[in-house]
């Protein structure tokens, strides 16, 4: 069982929404109920559900996007490889790594600034943004620290995430990023590591 988001910034989009795939009949039946107001048959609601039905237009967009996905991921991976090579020599920054057991899709290219880096994450983002580099801070907190989940008392279960999350920022590697853009990004980040 897996879930996929088709939000506008994802590797593949239908504008909004997502998809659940499963080989478990029970999960499939529950997902179908939840997506259509909990309706088991016409006007018979057996659980509280939602309106998660995808429109035919969104599905058609998704089918076209799906044919392009492999090429888009390949381009993201190529861009990430160039960016990683350019950032590897910059002291105090840790680009994302790809283990030999995985294939990264680079939906996001997240860089970690080490505590000794001369600028904070927010200063990095602000400076790069001023220089025209599409940069943003990564997520502000682990999911369990969000208001909706805080009272479930799951605190402290991800100490490494809590330690590094305030030092993570994202750089662009989407398919529209070209070689000159990557060069500009690396040069701008390199200047941050050598403040005047």
Residue positions per predicted region:
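PLP-dependent aminotransferase class I/II
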Residues: 23-196
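Conserved RNP beta-strands of RNA recognition motif
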Residues: 17-22
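Conserved active-site segment immediately N-terminal to the catalytic lysine
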Residues: 1-13, 41-46
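Short glycine-enriched loop/turn motifs at secondary-structure junctions
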Residues: 11-15, 103-105
């Amino acid at each position: 069982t897996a879930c996929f988001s088709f939000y506008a910034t994802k590797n593949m989009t239908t504008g909004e929404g997502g998809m659940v795939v499963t080989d478990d009949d029970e999960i499939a039946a529950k997902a179908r109920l939840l997506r259509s107001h909990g309706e088991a048959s016409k006007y018979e609601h057996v659980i509280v559900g939602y309106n998660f039905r995808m429109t035919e237009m969104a599905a058609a967009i998704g089918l076209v996007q799906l044919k392009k996905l492999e090429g888009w991921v390949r381009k993201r991976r190529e861009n990430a490889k160039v960016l990683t090579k350019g950032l590897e020599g910059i002291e105090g920054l840790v680009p994302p790594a790809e283990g030999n057991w995985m294939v990264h899709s680079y939906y996001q290219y997240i860089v970690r600034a080490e505590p000794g880096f001369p600028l904070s994450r927010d200063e990095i983002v602000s400076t790069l943004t001023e220089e025209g580099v599409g940069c943003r801070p990564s997520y502000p907190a682990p999911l369990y620290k969000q208001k909706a989940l805080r009272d479930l008392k799951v605190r402290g279960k991800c100490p490494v995430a809590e330690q590094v999350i305030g030092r993570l920022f994202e750089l662009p590697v989407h398919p529209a990023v070209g070689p000159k853009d990557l060069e500009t990004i690396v040069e701008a980040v390199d200047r941050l590591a050598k403040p005047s």
